[in-house]
A protein has these predicted regions:
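Catalytic-loop motifs flanking and including active-site residues across diverse enzymes
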Residues: 30-34, 142
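Short hydrophobic segments within beta-strands
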Residues: 18, 85-86, 132
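Residues forming the Rossmann-fold NAD(P)(H) cofactor-binding site
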Residues: 2
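Dinucleotide-binding Rossmann-like beta1-alpha1 core, especially the glycine-rich loop
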Residues: 33-118
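Glycine-rich FAD pyrophosphate-binding loop
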Residues: 9-30
Length: 184
């Protein structure tokens, strides 16, 4: 909701946001601030569809973090600028084949042993370490950046006061807001 509110406002629309629970209390907080490009979907065997659709998300979000995207979130805190993914020897050959596929080529790099974080060096862990372009932002910081300029456009509403009108195919055709002053 907040992202869309910012986009609409940036494009000149007079928009407001009704929230029935807590701002960011759904997907924003559930994501833990993880911005990924679909590798988790690709690892499960889905190299098309969802994985392809979100492959560019890290690049898109990085542009927004620089203030160059469709929403300026340059004041949002970045917690980690990349992911590391480890695979043990049993999983390694299958993973190497997978990582060499066209859909992931150039997006993932093998980390040299001398560049391993202390944990991996100290424990002499067998396997391979990969650097992914995915990263982590501070979700509460993002909520603050997105909501701050729109405080006068944010409204908390009870779920019992809102009703969606639908056509015969269940498409939303209208919204009814009920209040003590009447129905809008």
């Amino acid at each position: 909701g907040l992202w869309l509110l910012n986009r609409l406002h940036n494009e000149g629309y007079q928009a407001i946001l009704f929230e029935t629970e807590v701002l960011g209390g759904g997907q924003t907080i559930a994501s833990q601030g993880i911005i990924h490009g679909g590798l988790k979907y690709a690892l499960s065997g889905s190299l098309s569809g969802t994985a392809s659709t979100i492959a560019g998300m890290p690049t898109r979000w990085r542009a927004c973090l620089k203030g160059e995207g469709d929403v300026d979130i340059s004041r949002c805190a970045l917690l980690c600028d990349h992911y590391l993914m480890w695979s043990d020897a049993n999983f390694r050959s299958r993973l190497k084949t997978f990582l060499g596929s066209k859909s992931l080529r150039g997006r993932i790099a093998t980390v040299a042993t001398d560049e391993y974080p202390d944990f991996f060096r100290q424990h002499n862990i067998k396997g391979s370490l990969y650097r992914l372009p995915d990263f982590v932002i501070d979700a509460p910081s993002l909520l603050s950046v997105l909501s701050e300029p729109h405080q006068d456009r944010l409204f908390k509403i009870s779920p019992s006061l809102i009703a969606f009108e639908q056509d015969s195919q269940a498409n939303v055709t209208g919204v009814q807001l009920n209040s003590t002053r009447g129905t809008i």
